[in-house]
Amino acid sequence: MPVTTDPGYQGPSVHVAASLPKHDVSSSVLIVPVVSASDSDESEDRPGAVVAAAEPFLTAAAVAEIEAGLRALEATGGSDQVHRLVAPSLPVGSVLTVSLGKPRSEWPADTIRRAAGVAARSLGRAEVVITTLAELPGESGASICSAVVEGLMLGSYRFTDFRSRKTAPKDNGLRKITVLANAKDAKKQSAHGATVASAVATARDLVNTPPSHLFPAEFAKCAKTLGESAGLEVEVLDDKALQKAGYGGVIGVGQGSSRTPRLVRLIHQGSRLAKNPKNARKVALVGKGITFDTGGISIKPAASMHHMTSDMAGAAAVIATITLAAQLKLPIDVVATVPMAENMPSGTAQRPGDVLTQYGGITVEVLNTDAEGRLILADAIVRACQDNPDYLIETSTLTGAQTVALGSRIPGVMGSDKFRDRVAKTSQQVGENGWPMPLPDELKDDLKSTVADLANVSGQRFAGMLVAGAFLREFVADGVDWAHIDIAGPAYNTDSPWGYTPKGATGVPTRTMFAMLEDIANHG
């Protein structure tokens, strides 16, 4: 029976088998991991790459056949190399080898996830795959089957919603995955991986959807549909409700657009699933949902402005994370607060020098309308803290300074020292590679305003990410452990695909946040 996933992104079906099929499946591709041969293995009769994890699924004859093909292709076994071979002794159409580099006694889950992603991107028109990747020995605690499924699904992801027949792919993409595995929990792990990958793909879909089709009202509608399908309680505040309740940041940022802002609340009451509901933790999630960011009156340069379709990636990840928590029935309470607005220049847009009253009463002088994300996040943080959470995790494409400091693949993590470090460590474990950043107390002095409680930017050129983090810290309630994940670069890949990461939306940091929820559910 296939492993099924809940409603949402419709990816391939996932199956687990204890052996290769006996009958001919010539339409399928067998993905086999290989490693570089050790010095003692290399000879005229041995290739530079050798098959890993052969037993019990591949016979000695099949291994010899594959390695002969690798030798003919002069494969070296270097990381991320792929080769397509024909192995007549096997009941498959072809064999795709993916190299993991030097041999190891234990493999990190993300190394295997990445190899699976590389293989998936090399499948061509193949719709059915079988793989022995799950038989690689993982590090202690690593969920290898889950990593394999995640890598294959995320690597094969593609977004074609707006392509006509003229440019749409002629094939259906990857439709079926069979993981060869003998582990007792292989089916459970594979199901977990499929559900996680589907959530990440949902986040990617939202980010890749152009702002012509995903504006605040439509984004809120999508969030409501996804939330209700997962069994979440959903509350949507429109512009009139936001104005009445005093969400000055969201209203101020959104007032320049004809498309009015929204704020969505998604609630997972998982504590009732806990063994001891009274001791179950409560987590608040907040994600920035700027559906398009021109910069407003402080307008951005035109050259790369089209990438600002991704300025709602934090919101997409938060929505995907909480629906995933509901689908996998995490025994903790999770509440997501998601502000949504479009930042446009117009005769009604906020001006540099305007003063906003944020939700909760703090006044902010808007010195730069392109520092708008922190304004809507501030409203959402105050509202989220009214629920008295134990932890607050928020994420956004907060600052271009994140890419200056850490590049396009490493999120910056700021917040309460211990919790920040916990989030960063978890991010590194799942392969999203967050890095802890400091928030020096003196940064608050740079946010002084001559007319309001705070200014939304400092007069300094430097430490822009940290200054934004210091601004957000002013809105976090005392006693709440919190972390902000700045994904300005990692949320959207403008370079070539790599690993299981496509060009365009990446889904970062969905897996980090969900892994944190799992960790909190298990360890408090």
Curated annotation (Swiss-Prot):
GO terms for molecular function: manganese ion binding; metalloaminopeptidase activity. Coiled coil: none annotated. The active site is at K300, R374. Mn(2+) 1 binds at D293, D370, E372. The keyword Lipid metabolism does not apply. It is an enzyme of class 3 (hydrolase). Keywords: Aminopeptidase, Cytoplasm, Hydrolase, Manganese, Metal-binding, Protease. GO terms for biological process: proteolysis. It catalyses: Release of an N-terminal amino acid, Xaa-|-Yaa-, in which Xaa is preferably Leu, but may be other amino acids including Pro although not Arg or Lys, and Yaa may be Pro. Amino acid amides and methyl esters are also readily hydrolyzed, but rates on arylamides are exceedingly low; Release of an N-terminal amino acid, preferentially leucine, but not glutamic or aspartic acids. Its EC number is 3.4.11.1, 3.4.11.10. It is found in: Cytoplasm. One of its GO terms (cellular component) is cytoplasm. SUPFAM superfamilies: Macro domain-like, Zn-dependent exopeptidases. Binds 2 manganese ions per subunit. Its main location: cytoplasm. Mn(2+) 2 binds at K288, D293, D311, E372. NCBIfam families: PRK00913.1-2. Presumably involved in the processing and regular turnover of intracellular proteins. Catalyzes the removal of unsubstituted N-terminal amino acids from various peptides. This is Probable cytosol aminopeptidase. It comes from Mycobacterium leprae (strain TN). The gene is pepA.
